[in-house]
């Protein structure tokens, strides 16, 4: 059922809308972590390093599609808040054509550049064989990623966060079951883990597409053969491409750091692969809360409800900070037991490095929690370019400091670069908000047109 976030109690509306998104991403992390956990436990540290590096690469590639879908979703939310049915349908058609074209191009490039990845990511020879086998299969799932994220973004934009959760749950359970069967039962190795992921992706992508087309009459506009107005393409591009740039820059920075991590050898690669999964579980709820917050802001922005936006912002900051403080304490205390979920107790070097990473990152989750809210805010009020600026500051700082500090203090310097980047981006985003807040929260069609240009 679609939910109108422009009415009802502010925090209750936001939290109830966010809950299925958080549960869905928990399942997504289970989905992503299944390969890592099963491979690490049953195939060893070299295979774990291969899958971990592959995950960073796939996150970068799919972030392009995710950014396009998120940007389109922000515009869908604004049109839904305006009750502009015609503009919403036209935006749906324009965005689908644009993102489908990018998906097909990206898929072709991914396969064409397969053998260039080894040198770009500085993958050790003993890891590359498993990594190549894994990514050659998971690249086939890029189209399924487009299907799921496009239709999930539309459903969330109009207030339906339950249907995406259902299909994610189905695919997560299927992925874990197939992982166990392919890797342990059939001894397919890393190729089995990759195959399990791709099958699960297509089940969720095709399933949510069929359901959305049945439930949402606006999506039937996709069947129309009437010309797509150039103004709608520009409007969608203005939102989607900037959000795509934000997501891509974010994950390109992570990919560059992955290359630096790889230069320290298989043990550090394996520690990073496991710790990043734990990290993602820890701050994932505030990431999804930030996305729910963005939909809330966008609907109310389109409806012109500035006071409701202000109340939502204050409440969202409080919820995010309280959650991050609690999770930081838990990760700090239980860092070693968490690492033992992914690696055997005898792998002392891997465990020690993973614990060091979690103690540094985990102490500063408030920084990333606030940053997710800032990303969501600027995306929702027709300022996606500001989200790009914050991402460049955060990731630019991270990459530069990672290379500088690691040359002086070793791999620990890479870990310290992350929270420093969060802090600088937070300060920039907050200062910009307080300088421009009156203009930011005032909706007008001219705001959307400025985004196009």
Q: What are the residue ranges of the model-derived segments?
A:
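Short alpha-helical transmembrane segments in multi-pass integral membrane proteins
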Residues: 1-18, 76-141, 185-241, 297-364, ...
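Residue-level signal for short hydrophobic patches within transmembrane helices
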Residues: 7, 11-30, 34, 57-64, ...
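Transmembrane helical elements of multi-pass membrane transporters/channels
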Residues: 16-35, 137, 171, 200-204, ...
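Transmembrane alpha-helix boundary and packing residues in multipass membrane permease domains
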Residues: 21, 25, 37, 74, ...
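Helix-terminus/linker motif at the lipid-water interface of multi-pass membrane proteins
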Residues: 30-49, 118-125, 181-188, 248-277, ...
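Small-residue-rich hydrophobic transmembrane alpha-helices
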Residues: 48-108, 145-164, 271-335, 368-382, ...
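Hydrophobic transmembrane alpha-helices of multi-pass small-molecule transporters
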Residues: 60-63, 175-179, 205-209, 281-284, ...
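Short runs within selected transmembrane alpha-helices of multi-pass transporters and secretion channels
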Residues: 69, 137-156, 164-172, 193-208, ...
